[in-house]
Amino acid sequence: MILGFLSDSHGCFEALEKGLEALRRHGAEQIFHLGDSVGYFPGWSAADALRRESIPCLKGNHEAMLLLDEQDPAKDPMTQLGTTARQASPVQLKWVSQLPQSLRIEQDNVRILLVHGSPREPLREYIYPDTSLEPFFDVDADVVVMGHTHRADLREVGGKTFINTGSCALPRHPGGLGSAAVLDTGTGHGELIRFPIGNETRKAAARLSLHEAIVNRIAQYPES
C-alpha cells in the first residue's frame, strides 16, 4: 500500500491542495497530515479541508498553542493564532481538540509511528536534517514520520527509516519547494516529493493579512 504524508499546511488551503494533488499523483491510497494545520495564514481553510476529506491528522505545536491560549502577543502578528482562535466555531475547536499527538499504524507488517515533532517530544522537538537520530534507534517502529522543521529529510539508519515531510506550505529548505512524502509499505521504499507552491502561497497572501516576514519568504518561492 502506498501511504502519503504531509505536514505544516499552516492555514494555506491553496498549498495544501497542491500537496494533496502531488501525493495522489504518486499513488497515495491513504494520506496523513502531521500537524500545524493552523498558524501564519490566519483562518481555518486548510483545517476545514482536512476535516471534510476525513484525512487523519495529528496535533502540532500550533494547534496546542491555540487551544491552550498560549499565543505570545509579541509573536501573534506572525503566527496569527489569536486571529484564528477568534474565528473558530465550536465544531472547529472540537475537531482540533480531539487531534492526537501521535499515531501508530501497521500496514504489510511495517510498523509506522507518526509524530509532529519527535518520538520523545511529539509536539515541540525539532529533528533537523543534521540532528543525530541515534536516540531514536530503539523506538518501537520500523518507520518514523515527522514534520515541524519545515525541512524535508529522509534517512535510513539504525535499521529504521526516518522521514521528515517538510512543509507543504512554508518550506525553509533551499529552493523553496513544498514537500511531502510517500511510503510503499510493500517494498519499504520511502520517497520525498517536492512541488512548486509560489503561485498558491502568493494567491493566499493576496486574500489574507500576513506578517511581513511571511510575505517576504513566499515572495522567494519559484513560480508554479
Predicted regions and their residues:
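Active-site-proximal segments of metal-dependent phosphoesterases and phosphodiesterases across multiple
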Residues: 74-79, 107-139, 171
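Anionic-ligand binding region
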Residues: 126-155, 160-163, 178
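Core catalytic region of metal-dependent phosphoesterases/phosphodiesterases
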Residues: 2-97
